[in-house]
Design a protein with these regions (language model features):
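Conserved beta-strand hairpin/beta-sheet module of binuclear metal-dependent hydrolase folds
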Residues: 1-41, 114-126, 131
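Core dinuclear metal-dependent hydrolase active-site scaffold
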Residues: 11, 90-118, 122
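Divalent metal-coordination and catalytic microenvironments
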Residues: 12, 24, 53, 87, ...
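Active-site neighborhood of phospho(di)ester-bond hydrolases with catalytic His/Asp-centered motifs
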Residues: 23-26, 45-55, 74-77, 104-107, ...
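Active-site environment of divalent metal-dependent phosphoester hydrolases
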Residues: 29-30, 54-60, 80-81, 110-112, ...
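Active-site metal-binding motif and surrounding structural segment of the metallo-beta-lactamase
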Residues: 29-74
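Divalent-metal (often Zn2+) His-rich catalytic cores of metallo-beta-lactamase-fold enzymes
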Residues: 145-204, 208-211
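C-terminal regulatory/interaction regions
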Residues: 199-249
Length: 249
């Protein structure tokens, strides 16, 4: 799994507060977990662990980390929770005076969530929006229609100035949320048009027959993503499969 510079784990708390929320503890890497604990501090408390989605580079250490700090893990998917509290669109998490609003942003995965921190005008996007480059729509769990809707929702929040910055799951902080979301929306539409163009020579029946062929998505990747490092073609193929499913729905 590609993680750019590694997984960003976010430790959120109000200034002067002891109690914090930890978002996406990440993989069970000793140095990574030690860095999180150093930020929490020896006199700090963890009120909850929140997960943006289930991919292991965000979630694998969550339960063990939470048990060590005596708190729960809240996630959309029950399989990744620790304790009885779930997490879903519209929920508000409050810890130590900090308010976090949950936004459902499916698409990268079916369980993807983003977390709005009103006090900072920032949104934690997990893998829905990255700090560098664009993300993969992880078909079949991820779905392009849902992803486009999620981008539109985030874009609306940026347009109304509810969010100014994006704190992503990988890569650097984005100071200008609106510009990046503009790019993400236009990029997805451009790629979709490129896939559509690659298929326009096929009739509907021929398309449906060839969609089942395992070589078609890779053939499209080689045309549409010819400007992308072949190392990334595996991830690109997942997005192409999502685009094909979107086009023939």
């Amino acid at each position: 799994m590609m993680t750019l510079d590694g997984t960003n784990t976010w430790v959120l708390r109000e200034p002067g507060a002891r109690r914090c929320v930890v978002v996406d503890p990440g993989p069970p890497d000793a140095s990574h977990l030690a860095a999180i604990e150093a930020v929490v501090g020896t006199d700090g408390e963890v009120g909850a662990v929140l997960l943006t989605h289930h991919h292991f580079d965000h979630s694998e250490s969550a339960k063990e980390f939470a048990q060590r700090w005596g708190c729960g893990v809240r996630a959309l998917d029950p399989e990744y929770r620790l304790g009885s509290e779930g997490l879903g669109d519209g929920d508000v998490v409050e810890t130590g005076g900090l308010e976090i609003r949950v936004i459902g942003t499916p698409g990268h995965t079916s369980d993807s969530l983003s977390f709005l921190v009103p006090a900072d005008g920032a949104v934690l996007t997990g893998d829905t929006v990255l700090g560098r480059g664009t993300t993969v729509v992880a078909h079949p769990d991820g779905e392009l229609g849902a992803y486009l809707d999620s981008l539109d929702r985030l874009h609306q929040l940026a347009t109304t100035h509810e969010i100014a910055a994006i704190w992503p799951g990988h890569g650097p902080v984005i100071a200008d949320a609106l510009s990046v979301l503009d790019y993400y929306v236009s990029h997805r539409q451009q790629r979709l048009e490129q896939v559509r163009a690659a298929l326009e020579v096929l009739s509907s029946q021929e398309l449906r027959e060839r969609i089942a062929a395992e070589d078609l998505p890779r053939q499209i990747v080689e045309v549409v993503y010819s400007d992308v490092d072949p190392v990334l073609w595996g991830a690109a193929e997942l997005s192409v499969r999502a685009q094909l499913a979107y086009l023939i729905r």
